[in-house]
Amino acid sequence: MSSSASRSQKERAFFQTEPWDTIDPNLVGIDSLKSRLQILLAEIIRREFPKIKAQIDKSLADAKHMLEALGSDRDSTEQQRKFLEEVAMKFQKIRDDAMETQYHKHHVLKTNKSLRLPTLVADRCDLLVKEIVRNGHAVQFDHDIDIDGELNDTGEDDYKDHNVTERTVVRNPGQDELDELMITPPILPVPEEKEVKKWIEEEYRASRGYDLEVMDPSILALLWQTQSQNWDFITRNFINDIIAYVHRFFCTLLTEVCPDTRTRDALLSRMMDDMLASYRRAIEHVNFILKVERFGTLITKNHYFADTLGKIRSKRRESDMKGLAFRGRQWHYSYAKETDTELLVRVSDLTKGRRYSSNLDQAVEDLHDLLLVYYKVARKRFVDAVIAQAVDYFLLTGEESPLNILTPPFISSMSAEQLEQIAGENMASKNKRHDLKKQIAALEEGKKVLKA
């Protein structure tokens, strides 16, 4: 007889003697205790089962997420190439949606506004226009003949949040690689409040020859180069800011699609020369546009030039004629009353008007009008060219844009050594992958046990 059976027999014999024989047999003995403990354990398991299952599910999801963050296995060259191609495709997908302002499609675009590149660029382009309008000219033009009323607009309300004379490049820590490109120009001088015609006369006297004192195109070119000198500062700061936005977008998005720091840093290092080259091309193109507009031939086929020049001269002649005008009855209107009057000018007075004290005065006035109108035409053309060419083509959408560097073909061009250097796993990463796989297998086995 086993010890367990012998013990049970002795317990029954004991509880059949007085006074223990009065106790319910189901409440005494080891066998009764064992049965009740089993019932209690079953109740506890039923009560705690949902919590245990939820904890296992959470631990399993966390482990799978960490394994997914490590990417696919990267032991072989093909596995490494596949891993980096997946990174490139994820990058392209989010980049394309960001450039189309489809911010709702990705959580990172909804939460990280530094990735809303088109919006940042649009805001900075608006600021460029305001800066050029407010501070682009070195000397204020004549207020009296500014047809559009925009060249001498102080625009204080537009500049509450921007110190235009001391703008600095908007960069984040970690963008030191851009330092050699982003040479901050000297402080921008604000437009001088001196009399523009006096300035033109001074320049004219310092540059004229001894022939007839008429409007000289060579003097106009000198005036133009001085009047547009502030464009350099404004435009260089502008392109620096756009490059900073693009670089921050690239690095932030790369961090999102490639969380592994070692792989990301190696991949970024591999692309950095190409990225810096694309930034240089944009800066060089801005310099080219500045050179053409400021030092090239003064030329335009825009009819706005002739139209506006005619308006300015008509406005000045109208001002001259007001001194010769008188009030007369409106006979030419059939409905006019005898008391209705208007300003009239005699035909014989049309030959009268502005009298210049010298040929120099007329030459200065002609130079001012031509400089004013050409400045407005060239300024609009210049801003459009910088945005369309240097920003849109060279930095955002062109074939050699920095945003088009990380592509599957770029990954395919890498050698086996480069792939190993960039995507090959170190021992710590391999051990972490092994531990996660082991943990996932154990948790999945636990789920099977719970289901059973």
Residue ranges: model-predicted function:
Residues V28, P50-A452:
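Extended, charged coiled-coil "stalk/tether" helices of large eukaryotic trafficking and scaffold proteins
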Residues M1-Q38:
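Conserved phosphate-handling catalytic cores of large alpha/beta enzymes
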